[in-house]
Amino acid sequence: MNIIQSGITAENSSIAIIIARFNEFINKNLLLGALDTLKRIGQVHEENILKIYVPGTYEIPTIASYIAKSGKYDAIIAIGTIIKGQTDHFKYIANDTSSSLSRISTQYFLPITLGILTTKNIEQSIERSGTKMGNKGSDAALAALEMINVMKKLKKVIYY
């Protein structure tokens, strides 16, 4: 019986982080959490991390698709914050972004992890970007590291 389990170091891996500028004061903390996890826990070298800024969360999938198609990266981390307002706009942005990233991930066999907050208010966003509720950017980076390792091990079992 073969069992594949993930590891968390990925020092020779290349990772792209796509960051939404909208709600930048929250996303900045998510990015810092992701970078800290990649470097300190994952041992990923600074020169192997590409940071790309886009206007908002809705624009992340377009860039993720472009990066995935290049085949140059081992994972993508999406960073953004969607805060519920008075209209249903929140739902559409969150659903479209999430489903698009999932589709890109499966289409290109590339881990894309979500450091995207979907919250009811600013307070919840602040709590999830490094205070009471941890840092979802850090969580997304950790998931990316684990998925990189699972994919590398799985390729050896399937293709070699």
From Swiss-Prot:
Domain of life of the native organism: Bacteria
Residues annotated as catalytic: H89 (proton donor)
Molecular function in Gene Ontology: 6,7-dimethyl-8-ribityllumazine synthase activity
Family matches, as InterPro entries: LS (IPR034964), LS/RS (IPR002180), LS/RS_sf (IPR036467)
SUPFAM superfamilies named among the record's database cross-references: Lumazine synthase (SSF52121)
One of the protein's GO biological processes: riboflavin biosynthetic process
Listed CDD domains: Lumazine_synthase-I (cd09209)
Catalyzed reactions: (2S)-2-hydroxy-3-oxobutyl phosphate + 5-amino-6-(D-ribitylamino)uracil = 6,7-dimethyl-8-(1-D-ribityl)lumazine + phosphate + 2 H2O + H(+)
Spans through the membrane: none
Gene3D superfamilies found in the cross-reference section: Lumazine/riboflavin synthase
Binding-site positions, 5-amino-6-(D-ribitylamino)uracil: F22, T57, Y58, E59, T81, I82, I83, L114
Enzyme kind, highest EC tier: transferase
Family membership noted in the UniProt record: Belongs to the DMRL synthase family.
Its biological purpose: Catalyzes the formation of 6,7-dimethyl-8-ribityllumazine by condensation of 5-amino-6-(D-ribitylamino)uracil with 3,4-dihydroxy-2-butanone 4-phosphate. This is the penultimate step in the biosynthesis of riboflavin.
Cited NCBIfam families: lumazine-synth, PRK00061.1-4
Assembly mode: Forms an icosahedral capsid composed of 60 subunits, arranged as a dodecamer of pentamers.
Protein name per Swiss-Prot or TrEMBL: 6,7-dimethyl-8-ribityllumazine synthase
Protein source organism: Buchnera aphidicola subsp. Acyrthosiphon pisum (strain Tuc7)
Lineage: Bacteria, Pseudomonadati, Pseudomonadota, Gammaproteobacteria, Enterobacterales
